[in-house]
A protein has these predicted regions:
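Anionic coordination/interaction segments
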Residues: 1-189
Length: 189
């Protein structure tokens, strides 16, 4: 239909639909400036959302740093937009004076392509293809990363990361705590 995006799952139609909806895939994320605190993995911001802090991880197997949650756009995921990671918000006070979250990071290379292609292949009535379905947690070969934030007073934030290797062998994990100022100067990036 002239002037409308293709509906099929072939790459040309997917690209057209992304442009119409103004969304971009995870692969573009590392080329775009962070805009908010929630852009980062297990991130937090100050009250004005000016100073942001988050964690980046690298297991020496992935081709890129793991600094943002991997997800599928509404056009890639068979149920619609969908994060394909294992993370859990465990605790928080109403004032956020204490917060705790858990993230599970595979020791194997993250299956970006497999998750995208398999979910594209499936229809809306099919079950989702999740990270665990790709076998990356087999034999408990993953790291658990526990993030805790606590306010010592209104202007003092304490941060603690506790990492545990659940696998049967030693494995390398690089932790990169990252602070940045929110991008307010260029909204088109």
């Amino acid at each position: 239909v002239p002037g409308r995006a293709a509906v099929g799952h072939h790459s040309g139609g997917l690209l057209c639909r992304r442009k119409l909806l103004g969304v971009f895939p995870h692969d573009h994320a590392r080329s775009r400036a962070y805009r908010w605190g929630e852009d980062g993995l297990l991130g937090i911001t100050n009250r004005q959302c000016r100073l942001c802090f988050a964690l980046a991880l690298w297991n020496e197997k992935d081709p890129i740093l793991n600094e943002r949650l991997f997800g599928l756009t509404g056009l890639e995921g068979n149920p619609g937009e969908d994060v394909k990671e294992e993370y859990f918000y465990l605790d928080s006070t109403p004032t956020h004076s204490y917060m705790k979250a858990l993230y599970l990071y595979p020791q194997a290379a993250f299956p970006y392509t497999e998750l995208t292609e398999e979910n594209l292949r499936r229809g809306p009535s099919d079950p989702e293809y999740e990270l665990a379905d790709a076998g990356v947690f087999d034999e408990n070969r993953y790291f658990s990363v526990l993030a805790e934030y606590a306010k010592a007073d209104p202007e003092d934030l304490l941060i603690r990361f506790t990492v545990e290797n659940h696998g049967p062998e030693p494995a390398v994990l690089h932790l990169l705590p990252t602070a940045w100022f929110r991008n307010t100067w260029s909204w088109g990036c």
